[in-house]
């Protein structure tokens, strides 16, 4: 099985703090000076809920039926792959290496996509795998529906010219490798959505913008909304990375006459302060991938920090004059951040914050949970770096589910002290904790149901992260 290892892993930095491997939140601006960045909260105008249809909000999510042990024993959808609406235009891709850490995250992407019956094709781009790792991964993925695929690439972590290593080189180079391969989309009007591997589906992703439930923040207005993603009109999630890249040596990075060098600070924030999911017409994504791969080593040369690849994407999009429609509703991640899908969560009544019933009761949800922060309420916690790599095995137990009234607790345990929460902070943290754990448990249960011999699967809820 994939990801053999200890049940629990509590791994931290020498200074006792867990590494964060994602942007510290929408509505934050990274300031150069520290290896992980110093972040200053920017006060942003409130989000706007677009007055449009709620098509698809009634979607039934099979994994969310998990409520007891053994879970969902009588739910047929937990013992077979679900059928999803066909869409030969839509491709969702995400970049990983072949570590156990990213193996379990990848499986979580596929199983939660299956749970919401995500249309289209989903592709894991796996870079730097050994031949043995490729064989092991492919053997498992051969049991998946044809709409779930893996594409292997060389390891791009070291830049051939500079000799410098950067984990996230794999992201643009891997995307370009896939787009140049025989596995690339065949439809001339295909839409490609680039995700992160630490995404869990709460509802299906669609490229039909106005048929979705949309959130956006000023300066974006209702007049900026488009019917759907099309050539020349990409869409992405708002990230608070701001306009810092305009202060880089843009002419060195993108060329003397690059349009990127002429982008104003306000336009950089409005059109290019974005992150995953990036959603674009395949022709646009090909051009972006090429420029992104060309620019990222030069950006990293000037800015050798975590966000280099995101800034390189912004410069590539600006260079190609492909302004992005910046939307807020695609994901939630940082409980204190503006510009995410939190208005959906803030409007939930208490009974639905930690309840699996929310989607079935017409409660609005973000598309993804982006679980890249440390979430804590009371004595409950979750961080992806503390998840054992053997989560998706027959032997591994499941997570203990937090109580459904967790949002009523307005404090968190920091070890040596308690930190008080506002009601909103408690509700957001509880939402992330309950739903990430429920989603991962449901995914692990379905993995066991599909892959383990009768009587050999461990359904006990024993894992608790703090």
Residue ranges: model-predicted function:
Residues 108-110, 139-142, 207-218, 320-323, ...:
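Short secondary-structure boundary/capping segments
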Residues 21-170, 179-188, 445, 449-465:
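N-terminal anchoring/stem segment of glycosyltransferases
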Residues 102, 132-134, 159-160, 200-204, ...:
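Short catalytic/ligand-binding loop motif for oxyanion handling, primarily in non-cytosolic enzymes
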Residues 248-360, 367:
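Catalytic core and acceptor-binding pocket of nucleotide-sugar-dependent glycosyltransferases
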Residues 167-239:
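GT-A fold catalytic core of metal-dependent nucleotide-sugar glycosyltransferases
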Residues 2-26:
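Helix-loop boundary elements of multi-pass alpha-helical membrane proteins
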